[in-house]
Amino acid sequence: DCIDRYPDLFVGLASADLSKPMEGVRELRKYVKEHDFKGLRIVQWLWDKPCTDPLYYPLLAECVELDVPVCLQVGITGPLCTSRTGQPSHIERIALDFPELKIVCGHIGAPWHEEMIVYARKFPNVYIDTSAYVPKRYPKALVDFIKGSGKHKVMFGTNFPMLMPADCLKQLDILELDEETTQLFLHDNAKRVFKL
């Protein structure tokens, strides 16, 4: 409803039932083709399965066919459940298996953020978003990556309503990004990856 009413403000990401991957493929295809959704979002810990589980693979292949990214949570979980599903090493496997798949890794990858940065640097199809973290909590290694070789690889995110965009944007000056990097971080990287 929000997407239909405010198409200049909102875009959709599809979700999928991993227990029925082929039904999920059909739903993903429908939402991308009929409703202009821009990607697939899967929170691995909800399913207690890492993204390397075979149930993901039909959906990942369909993302490649539709040329939309998959957005995954990478890092420790907030709820009291295992964080093993969000370890960055799983991203390496799917990046190798699906080199054409755009993979957006949410939540920075903390506490394994340095490993996450290595994979974003290593694979042209792997990206990081900063959702669930305010700028003052970004690890120094991530800020250095944004300012350097990773300026085309990291996207601003908030995980709204957990964090309010305005509150995160107020802290942006802490990062001391130049104008070009700020534009990439806040806008251009997401525009390119999600084809906005």
Predicted stretch roles:
Residues 34-39, 62-69, 97-101, 120-127, ...:
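Glycine-enriched alpha-helix->loop->beta-strand junction motifs that scaffold or abut catalytic
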Residues 82-90, 113-122, 138-146, 162-174:
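Histidine/acidic-residue-rich catalytic or RNA/ligand-binding cores of hydrolases
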